[in-house]
Curated annotation (Swiss-Prot):
Keywords: Cell membrane, Membrane, Transmembrane, Transmembrane helix. Belongs to the BI1 family. The chain crosses the membrane at residues 25-45, 50-70, 74-94, 105-125, 135-155, 158-178, 196-216. This is Uncharacterized protein PM0402. The keyword Membrane applies. It is a multi-pass membrane protein. InterPro entries: Bax_inhibitor_1-related. CDD domains: YccA_like. GO terms for cellular component: plasma membrane. Its main location: membrane. The keyword Transmembrane applies. It is found in: Cell membrane. The lineage of its organism: Bacteria, Pseudomonadati, Pseudomonadota, Gammaproteobacteria, Pasteurellales.
């Protein structure tokens, strides 16, 4: 009887994990599509790039709101508001590249982002490896990136920019590995929080690859 209860408990846990993973990827797909549409509208209307204060207020304000509402239906609306805002911020950035005939860099960054995401997801889902050991590395990288961004305000150096962008690529890649593993091992049971976490990693990854490819192309 006891072994049967344990087996039923494991089956229930496995079903819940699959449900969270399925819902996460479904919502992630919807938010990526929505963000792309908003970015396209932002580009078409030539909307200005938000200033630093608006960017920080919008990002962290909507992020906090989404996490606060993640256990309710309003969390989904907040998720779309958050990802839509990030889509809006992408519009002016992409316009700069397109207007300078650098659309190929945008495509390359997009392809690189997709490749990293699918490779990381496939690796974790195939191996079922527990990536919780990455948490310390991710935190350390966050501190280094924070210091690097502060330094970039005082030192205008292409090498510093490319170093920060390179670290962001590593940081975002590890974030995808960690969050995917966290879902399949039951560490994250809320698909809204999981979606936002992966979305932010993809956003940072895309922007970082754009910066790297742009700097490298200018040096040629």
């Amino acid at each position: 009887m006891e072994s049967r209860i344990v087996l039923d408990s494991r089956e229930t846990s496995l079903l819940n994990t699959h449900k969270v993973l399925r819902n996460t990827y479904f919502l992630l797909g919807l938010t990526l599509a929505f963000s792309a549409v908003v970015a396209y509208i932002s580009m078409s209307l030539n909307l200005p790039r938000p200033g630093l204060i608006l960017m920080l207020a919008g990002f962290y304000g909507l992020l906090f709101l989404t996490y606060k509402l993640s256990n309710s239906g309003l969390g989904i609306l907040s998720t779309f508001a958050f990802t839509g805002f990030l889509g809006y911020t992408l519009g002016p950035i992409l316009n700069v590249y397109v207007s300078h005939g650098a659309g190929d860099i945008v495509v390359l960054a997009l392809a690189g982002t997709a490749a990293v995401f699918f490779a990381c997801s496939a690796y974790v889902l195939t191996t079922k490896k527990d990536m919780s050991f990455l948490s310390g590395t991710i935190f350390a990288l966050f501190i280094v990136l924070l210091l690097g961004m502060v330094a970039s305000f005082f030192f205008q150096s292409p090498m510093l920019y490319i170093a920060i962008s390179g670290l962001f690529v590593v940081f975002s890649t590890l974030g995808i590995l960690y969050e995917t593993s966290n879902i399949i091992h039951g560490g994250e049971t809320n698909y809204i929080r999981a979606t936002v976490s992966i979305f932010v990693s993809l956003y940072n990854l895309f922007i970082s690859l754009l910066n790297i490819f742009s700097i490298l192309s200018n040096e040629d």
